[in-house]
Each structure stands twice: as C-alpha cells, then as structure tokens.
From Swiss-Prot:
PANTHER family: AGGLUTININ-LIKE PROTEIN 6, ALPHA-AGGLUTININ
Membrane topology: Lipid-anchor; GPI-anchor
Top-rank taxon: Eukaryota
Record organism: Candida albicans (Yeast)
Effect caused by changing residue 808 to S: In allele ALS2-2
Composition bias type Low complexity, residue spans: 548-577, 618-630, 723-746, 783-814
Extent of the ALS repeats: 364-395, 400-431, 437-468, 473-501
Effect recorded for residue 830 to P: In allele ALS2-2
Name this protein carries in UniProt: Agglutinin-like protein 2
InterPro entries associated with the record: Adhesion_dom_sf, Agglutinin-like_ALS_rpt, Agglutinin-like_N, Agglutinin-like_N_N2, ALS, Fibrogen-bd_dom1
Keywords from the UniProt entry: Cell adhesion, Cell membrane, Cell wall, Disulfide bond, Glycoprotein, GPI-anchor, Lipoprotein, Membrane, Repeat, Secreted, Signal, Virulence
Amino acid sequence: MLLQFLLLSLCVSVATAKVITGVFNSFDSLTWTRAGNYAYKGPNRPTWNAVLGWSLDGTSANPGDTFTLNMPCVFKFITDQTSVDLTAEGVKYATCQFYSGEEFTTFSSLKCTVSNTLTSSIKALGTVTLPISFNVGGTGSSVDLESSQCFKAGTNTVTFNDGDKKISIDVDFEKTNEDASGYFIASRLIPSINKVSITYVAPQCANGYTSGAMGFIVLTGDTTIDCSNVHVGITKGLNDWNFPVSSDSLSYNKTCSSTGISITYENVPAGYRPFFDVYTSVSGQNRQLRYTNDYACVGSSLQSKPFNLRLRGYNNSEANSNGFVIVATTRTVTDSTTAVTTLPFNPSVDKTKTIEILQPIPTTTITTSYVGVTTSYSTKTAPIGETATVIVDVPYHTTTTVTSEWTGTITTTTTRTNPTDSIDTVVVQVPSPNPTVTTTEYWSQSYATTTTVTAPPGGTDSVIIREPPNPTVTTTEYWSQSYATTLTITAPPGGTNSVIIRVHSSTNDESSESTFSTLSVPSFSGSISVVSIISRPHYVNSTVTHLPSSSSKPVDIPSSDAVTSTNDNSLTSLTGSENGKTSVAISTTFCDDENGCQTSIPQGSVVRTTATTTATTTTIIGDNNGSGKSKSGELSPTGSVTTNTATPNVPSTKVPSNPGAPGTGVPPPLAPSTETQTTNNVPGSPNIPATGTTDIIRESTTVSHTVTGNGNTGVPMNPNPALTTGTSLTGATNSATNPSHETGVNTGSGGSTNIVTPPSSATATVVIPGTDNGATTKGQDTAGGNSNGSTATTNTQGGNNEPGNQPGTNTTGEPVGTTGTQSVELISQQTTLSQQTTSSLISTPLASTFDGSGSIVQHSGWLYVLLTAISIFF
C-alpha cells in the first residue's frame, strides 16, 4: 500500500513539473584569474570567473520545476565539480548540473532543478560563481571554426540567456603575443574525454606553397596519438589568437602511428596556410614532442626548421586523471538543444567512463494549412544520420462576404473573425448607388458608342448612347388640300426615318377621258372649233367616236372647209359637216415626257363632235410632209396629226381659229415654230359640200396611251406595242382608184394623206400607229382580222353600186374589202395598265365637251342656241 502511494506521488510530481525561465536575472561580474603560466589574458586562458544573480519565487516556481542557463562560446567549466547548488542562508533551493560544450557544442550550459525546500511562501535570491574558459577556436571541427568568430581582441560583450531572459556584461580580452607569421602550436585539454587536442599551423608563405611537410614525434612522456581523429586542411586566415577561421581541403599524404604523425603537401595557393589537428592521450605532466617544419614558398627554396616543445598543463580543480579510458558517444534526441552527460560509473567495477552527447536530430519543418481553428504539430522521426520532419498544420479561415449599402460616401470593409468556427465574415458597406440618366443621341460616325459618366456618391450618373443616323425614306403623296406639308417620322435607333411630303393634287394631273352624248338633230351647216390649253399630263388620251347613220346621201365638202393641224404640242382644228347620220368625235391629249410631264408646260386638248354622211375621219402619224417613217416606241420629231371631218354649218362660237393670236385670249402653242399642213381632197373625188343635215347617234371608243417621245411633237405613241411597225401610216398622193371596192387607206408608202369619200356609204376609218404591216384590213372582225389593227373600215349603208359612190385610193392595187352589214366595228387593242384600251357604249342624250384636265364642261348657253337653230333647219 505504501509503495502504491509513493508511486502515485511520484507520478503527480512528474506530471506537475514545468519549465520556468528568468531565474538567472543578472550578470554581476566576469574576472580573469591566471591558472597557468600564460603570458596574456586571452579568452581561452583559464580561469574566467562569472558571477551571476538568481532568484526563486515560490508563488511561480514549484519543486521539480527546471530552468537552464545557456552560455554561448564557453568551452568548459574549470572545476572538478559536476554541479553547483543555489543556496541562501545555507538552504539549498536548486541544484545545477555542469554541461561543458568543449569541442562538441558551441556553448556550455547549466541545468537546474528546484528543490523541495521552496514553498509558495518563500522567495529566495542570491549569486553563483562559475569558473569557465571561452572557446575561440583551435581545431578544424565545425564547432571550433564557428567559435573562432565569437570574439576579437579588445572589448567584447558576453551574453548568457535563461530562456527569454538575457544577461550580459562587457569584458576586455587581450590578443596573443605570438608571431602570426611563424609556425603556431596549441594544445588544449578536454576533461570530459581526458584527451589533449594538438593543433599545428605551418609558417606563412604570402605567395603560396610549392611543397612542405609537418608533423611531430613523441620524445618523452606517456603520449599516444589517436590516428582516427586527424584533420588536415588549409585556412584562409587566423583570428586574433592564431586559430584557423576556415578549413578547405587540399591534396596531402598522411603517415600516422601512435608515436608520430607526418603530413606532406604541395601547391597551396596564395593566401592560404596548411594546418592539421589530432587527439592525443596524455598522462603525467612531462611531455616532450619534436616537430617537423619543412616548407618551400613559391619562388623560394625549401626551408627545414624543426623544433622541440614541452607541453605543460594547468591546475584543474579536479582532473579526474585516474588513467581510465574515457569514451564519448553521441545520441540523437528530440530536444531542441544539445547536452553532454556522464553515464553512471563505478571505478571498482566499470573500466570505461562514458560521456554521452545528447544531440538533437536535424529536422526540417513543413508548414501546411487547413480550414480550421487550432494549430497542430506532428513529427516524423528518422534514424541517426538522417533528417526528421516536423509538420506544422496552421489553420486558416474561409470568409463569406456580406455587402450592404449605407449613406456614407466611401466603401468600408470589416472582417469579423470567428473564434470558434473556420468561417469569418467580411462586411462590405458601399455607398448607395447614384440614379442614372440615359441619353440617346445621334452623331456623324457610322458606329454606336456608350459613355458612362460616374458622379460622386450622392450625384447622378449619366449614360450617353451615341447612335449613327438612321436612313431616311422620302415619300411624296397627293392630297386634296391646297397647301403642301412635310411630316418627318423619326424611328428609334436602327430603324428608318420617314419623310412624307403631301402636295396639292390638281385635277389637271388626271387623264381626260369620257364619252359624248348622242342627239338626233336636223341638217345644218356650221363649224365648231374648241381649243384649250392645259398643263401637260404624263399620258395620252385619244377618243374616237363613230356611229352608223340612219340614212345617207352624198355631200360635198368644199376644199376651203378642210381641217388643218399644226406640228406643235396643241391640236387646233375641228370641222363639222352635214347630210348624214354618222357622228365622229375625237379627243386627243398629248404629253411630251422627255423632261417629265410638268404642269408648267401647257398642252392641248380637243373635243370634236361631227355630223357627216359620207366623210372619212383619219388620224395619221407622220412627219410634216407625210413621207417619214415612224419607229416602234418613238415619235417623229416633226410629226403632226391631221384630222379631216365634214361638219354642218353651225353658228360660229367665235372660237379663234388661230390659237395664240394676239387678243384671242388663247395661249400660244409650246413649239417655237408652227408648220400647217392642209389636207386636200383625193383627186377624182367630188367636193364635199359644207352644209348638210344629220341625226347624231353616239357610240364611243376610248384609247389611252403613255407617251415616251423624244421631241416636242405632241404626237401620241403607239397605244399597243404589239401593233408596232416601222412603216409610216400614210397614203400615196398618186394612188389608183378602185371603183368596185370600198375605199381604205394604204399605209405602205409615204406621202400626204387625203380624205377619201365613197359614193354612198358612211365610213369611219382610224389608222392606229405602229402596226405590223402596211396592209389594209377588212372592217369585218374575223379571226386574225383587226387584232393587228392597221385600218378598220365600216360600211354602214348602201354598196359600191349606189349613185354617187367615188372610187377610193389604193396604192398597192389590191382590193381593200367591204362589209355589207349595218354594224359598226370598234377597234380596241388591250394593253398594259400604262397602255390601257377601253371600249364603252354610251347613249346618254347629253351634249358635252371636255377641257384639258378631263372635266366635262356643260355648254348650256350655246347648246340652247344650237338646238334652236337645228329646229329651224329641221
């Protein structure tokens, strides 16, 4: 039971022990005491006495707690003790063990443990004196080479540390008085292993060495050379106490035995000096050695200067020189510092005293990270000679960002760290967004751009969109108002703008097209001529009306009543005749479209109403002398229209026979020159009297054309392109007369055109320009008949054997052909919309004429006079 209690107490004590720091709190003094026959006060010369202050507070330190004093560049403790107690008033409060660095570590240490005498009510303090010597180099080991840089001759600062607590003092070290250019011999006792290290540096050659030899042999004394611990190298220089500060390799030969060693070398570069060091076992105080000193500097001869030296020691507190072999071993530990310890040794039993060097395993640290809160450490161990790995896993936090708006003018960012979780919060406060005004405008470039102008917080941002201009489509419309308007419709960007122009629509722009009323009137004589000047429309309207008569008789039309026409753009003639029931009316509107049908150019329009019995009305297109040929789709530049009708003698309407004469009130024709061609009777035919009586029965045929002339002729184009021909529709002046057939117009040759009047037949002949041939077609509509449309002749009453028939003109000598019916053949070719041909039959008993714009003019006044005159004659 008691044993269990003791074990439990021990476990509790071990479990509660901790490492404390700051016990050594002052460096009170550092003084040198001459311990041997030394000529100067060097740091490596014993003994330097360090007086340190310490304190233990029972409130923070507990029995079993440990603390350590590290003393860099201290070679060893100059004492025969292994430990020292920290006492106050004779009471021990801690025990400190000595661990000399010697040639194993660059520092020595004092490791202490708090005694059980320290309680929480006690605070102990005092001083401790430590006899030491400093390491300023000596051999070619890494420890000595590092220590060779610890101090320099003169004032130096010596610093020890107890954990984080550093204590320091300044001290003056003297430089060696030995010549640095000659050979140098140093020996040093290593108490822990009871060996002496001997260092030999060759004399200096400034330009380098050609060859050399160095070594020693034991002359007297019990000295054994350890050939397994020999180091050879060249050093770049020496410190203030003639110890090598570096070690580089060189080519050499070594000869070693327990009583002697020899090193030969060659070709050492300038600035370097050869050296070697070796361990020896020494017993007794009388040791004499003979040194070999041969060298040949570059450019010099071989020098041989051997010498003898006797080694003397210093007084150590406890040399422990009992003649036993001391073995030093090294063991790696996971501690962070290197320590030296002596294993238990019983001189009566054990023959070997072992000093164990506890050296930390070399480690490499790898730092990793993970999402978490705490830092973790893990160590991957390794055998001696290899490197262990320490893995440090450092936590990091992820973040989540929360953005909010606020009334400030700047953006703020605040990170809120979560101590218990791996997710932190980043709060971003941004100023409230400004309102935005977007403006779209047009510019002259062909591409679109967007510019954003950002105002300061609290202002208004602007977005300016620049678009290329839209294409524009302009449309002109006619409307009934008397004024013009322009309407612009702007489409959105990328669309098409529209410009609509509305202009006044004049009735003169329309085609004059109508029918004529038909009346039965008594025989009368008279002439009516109607001439009007209008704006030029862009099409041609020709109306030809011919009706069968109820009775017929020969009439004689005097040559003075022949109707004339001019070659300008206005038709100026109209003639009436009597003695018949046939009525012929022609309304023709011309348009010269070379420069476009412009309303500013006046045009002529004629409406003719004719009462005749045996008259032929012929419209022929040709030049002024009747000899030219028309081309398909063209007009003769000097062409004219000749219309010859027989009309009754009616009371004069006082319409001027010469349009454009002064005082007449009628505008002159547009053409600058006027050439008048008179149509004469065909030779051999009787003169047609200028008087007659007829009943007017109306039937009309309307033909509309589109003019594309090349001159100011005013002559209509061919109304049907399918009926065009290259032959002018004119008759020969010397044509033969065929008394046995009806008379027609032969268009096969050029020449003037005369009126042909068959003896007792009423005919109406229309020559349509541009036919396929010059032959005259029968009036009877048969298959393949008048569809080609050269000339249509209708025999309404009687035959060729009736009294008074006159032979017609036939230029080819071939019969023309007759019809023996009471019908009227109406010739009308269907064309396109721009060449439309329509036929209409109207029997409205109304007498009307048309003006140039196509409007019906009611002639109520003169119609009353006309009817009165007719009733008198009837």
